[in-house]
Regions:
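His/Glu-based metal-binding/catalytic segments typifying zinc-dependent metallopeptidases
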Residues: 29-31, 145, 215-259
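Structured loops at beta-to-helix junctions and adjacent beta-edge loops in soluble globular domains
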Residues: 18, 33, 89-91, 126, ...
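Short, solvent-exposed loop/turn segments at the edges of secondary structure
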Residues: 23-25, 63, 68-70, 80-83, ...
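N- or domain-start disorder-to-order transition segments that initiate the globular core
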Residues: 1-25
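Charge-rich, well-structured scaffold segments of protease-associated domains
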Residues: 2, 8, 66-216
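Short beta-strands and strand-coil junctions in structured, solvent-facing domains, enriched
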Residues: 35-38, 196-197, 251-254
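M16/MPP (pitrilysin/insulinase) zinc-metallopeptidase core fold and M16-derived inactive scaffolds
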Residues: 27-89, 155-158
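Soluble periplasmic/extracytoplasmic beta-strand elements of cell-envelope proteins
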Residues: 14-16, 27-31, 87-89, 187-189, ...
Length: 259
């Protein structure tokens, strides 16, 4: 059984800690409670766009990757319908570098037209590569709006239309950041060769002064029960025919989920 200790900062940041002295590394993972389901139907793909923008420099640090790499660390991130996840792994003696970097970009990004333009281009190319320029790439883009008629799960994480990313403005992304990125909307997990006392001390030092923000309660539309079969047939220039099926299932928190 993995032993996990918990700590809550006054600004609402939840911290989880697991001590492991079998390694000389420490991993910091931050989950923000924001995903593609929190986007407006006319501005899809923003959660994923932000995953990229978070590496474009913060208020006090112009380049995220360089200081982490100099400290012997590595990092990555991913976005889902429900959350956005960031992690860094560093040698234990350089762990404070990761705290410094993660806290600064939680505080505020270095919003600039240049960074936005670069990341928009990167995300648009990813959209084309994954969904438009390879066989079967648009399968789940077609499947999702069949499975969901009103819930925001009906569009993929990368976005419903490439134009939503192309048309994103600096004010749009600033609004999204201040709406969702805050200590009281995040969970910081720390695992590796660092004591609980040191983890608390560094969390308080680097994250404690970041003010909480007004995080509005979600009001997602409830998906009506599907009572009919749904079918779509499309023709593409692909090597072989393909059939894709999907079923609705219970919630992840239900006892039946793992059965």
């Amino acid at each position: 059984m993995i032993e996990v200790s918990r700590y809550l900062l006054p600004n609402g940041l939840k911290m989880l800690h697991h001590f492991d002295n079998s390694t000389q590394m420490v991993a910091l993972n931050i989950i923000y409670d924001v995903g593609s389901k929190d986007e407006e139907p006319s501005q899809t793909g923003f959660a994923h766009l932000f995953e990229h923008l978070m590496f474009g420099g913060s208020v006090n640090i112009p380049d995220f990757d360089t200081p982490l790499q100099k400290a012997g660390g590595e990092n990555n991130a991913w976005t889902s319908n429900d959350i956005t996840n960031y992690y860094s792994v560093v040698p234990r003696q350089n762990v404070e570098t990761a705290f410094w970097l993660e806290s600064d970009r939680m505080l505020e990004l270095n919003f600039s037209e240049k960074s936005l333009s670069v990341q928009k281009q990167v995300v648009c190319e990813e959209f084309k590569q994954r969904n438009l320029n390879q066989p079967y790439g648009d399968t789940y883009m077609l499947l999702r709006p069949m499975a969901y008629k009103v819930h925001p799960y009906r569009w993929p994480t990368i976005g419903k239309e490439i134009s939503h990313i192309e048309n994103a403005t600096l004010e749009d992304v600033k609004t999204f950041f201040y709406k969702h990125y805050a200590p009281n909307n995040a969970i910081l997990s720390i695992a590796g060769n660092i004591s609980f006392e040191d983890a608390v001390r560094l969390t308080e030092k680097w994250f404690g002064s970041i003010p909480k923000r007004n995080i509005a309660a979600r009001n997602l539309p409830e998906e009506p029960e599907q009572k009919e079969s749904r079918f779509l047939e499309v023709y593409r220039s692909v090597p072989l025919d393909a059939i894709t099926k999907a079923w609705h299932m219970c919630r992840r928190t239900d006892k039946e989920y793992h059965s």
